[in-house]
Amino acid sequence: MPSSYSFDVVSEFDQQELVNAIDQLRREVDQRYDLKDSKTKIDIKEDELSIVSLSDMTIESVKDILLQKATKRNLSLKIFDFQKIETIGGNMVMQIVKLKKGLSQEISKKLSKLVRDNMKKVTASIQGDSLRITGKNKDDLQAAINLIKKQEEEFDIALQFQNYR
């Protein structure tokens, strides 16, 4: 039996599920009567999406469909950071959607402080873009997971728990 147990708190999403949601979004935009002639283009890069269309209203409709498709693919809506809609040339508008992945130093510090203040039997250490919680007892780790889940709404980021051992 190991002398200590641990798990990692991370903020990630399944890239393939996002690609699938974007493909579904493109198909629906091509088929919907109100969006068919809007010249809407959705491009996906490593850490952002760009939506280009004729009007703000069309972009808002595409945004709603994106959120709906992401929900159906079990993606957290907290991964999307919608930027301001910008006007670009040719009577077109564009919106950049940044994709949140990984824990920032600030959020890692807040989570670490939360765990240290409320749980005396576990330790938290920041490891790059994740946070490792270690304790001698599995029950203490379960309590730490429950504590973090209760406070998750304070952090505007999707949290997952991995490597529970």
Swiss-Prot record:
MF (Gene Ontology): nucleotide binding
UniProt entry keywords in alphabetical sequence: Nucleotide-binding
Cross-referenced InterPro entries: DUF520, UPF0234-like_C, UPF0234_N, YajQ-like_sf
Superkingdom: Bacteria
GO CC term, one of those recorded: cytosol
Pfam families to which the protein is assigned, alphabetical: DUF520
Family note: Belongs to the YajQ family.
Physiological role: Nucleotide-binding protein.
Protein name per the record: Nucleotide-binding protein PMN2A_1813
Organism in which the protein naturally occurs: Prochlorococcus marinus (strain NATL2A)
